[in-house]
Amino acid sequence: MSGSYWTSMQRQKWQHTKPSLARERQRLWVMECQLFPQGLNIIVDSKPNSADSSNGNAANNGGGNGRSQLVATTKNIPITHRDLHYDKDYNLRIYCYFLIMKLGRRLNIRQYALATAHIYLSRFLLKASVREVNLYLLVTTCVYLACKVEECPQYIRTLVSEARSLWPEFIPPDPTKVTEFEFYLIEELQCYLIVHHPYKSMEQIVEALKEEPFKLTFTSDELQNCWSLINDSFINDVHLTYAPHIIAMACLFITVSIQGSNTKELSLTSAVTETLTSQSSLTPQQQTFFRFLAESHVDLEEVMDTIQQQIILYDHWDRYHEPWIKYLLHTLYLRPLSA
């Protein structure tokens, strides 16, 4: 346990470089290909071919309903496809984020605890595949353990009851299933449960900016935007690779860029690009923040990479398709054993 990120096990044991993270992901990829070479078979409704369609229409007209029938066919999703691979499937990443947030809001759990649950889930899914564990039970257990670590514990029966009300098909009524999974989770986390988050770093940076010579203050709306950006960043890998202050600085950079642009006409990508390229048209707030950024001696490459990952995330978010990922998980966990 450590009160400082710099001496914490989070930095010493769980902060990856990009190559080390890629090696962990490759190891999991190989394991998944060995354990689940058959991929996943799903049922897809499709329109019949022209010959079948004409026969079907004749039959339908005779029956008086006038409707063409859909044909159920089986489709195989190969194990090498990105679907259901946490590192490649942003649909799955965003869905996991919503699962944790949904359960947390039902129980009024503090954001710090939910952020810790996100980190636990990300670390666990470096070691295990969603194909071999119940994702909904994993989410419930991560929230349960995170609440204990962040000193806002939840009664396990209450937690399980709320989880069952959200996902009745996937959460067993027996609370001991969560406690059993908790031991499995702690083992995979190697008992390193203390997590340092960017929220505190953001508050420290904001306080530092209020002092001389910067005298820069943020409105409550700007701080809320930055807080929301940090929340969303847990979908990415940045919390596995960079220090909390790097993520906080990147989110403040995005906040300053957006506030200085016409957000009704510019996307996030355009706003950040405009800020980086149009030095002559920077607002006083942007100029002051960039001077602070330059004088703070943080790793600018890491800050820029975090910003880039956030932009990529929102690009994927625009194409997020929740019914598809829910259907895949439903098929994966609830299909007949003979399938």
Swiss-Prot record:
Localization per Swiss-Prot or TrEMBL: Nucleus
Pfam families in UniProt: Cyclin_N
GO cellular component terms attached to this protein's record: CKM complex; mediator complex
UniProt feature, compositional bias: Low complexity: 49-60
Xref: SMART domains: CYCLIN (SM00385)
Cystine bridges: none
GO molecular function: cyclin-dependent protein serine/threonine kinase regulator activity; RNA polymerase II core promoter sequence-specific DNA binding
Domain of life: Eukaryota
GO annotation, biological process: cellular response to heat; meiotic cell cycle; negative regulation of transcription by RNA polymerase II; positive regulation of transcription by galactose; positive regulation of transcription by RNA polymerase II
Subunit record text: Component of the SRB8-11 complex, a regulatory module of the Mediator complex.
Protein name (Swiss-Prot/TrEMBL): RNA polymerase II holoenzyme cyclin-like subunit
Name of the coding gene: SSN8
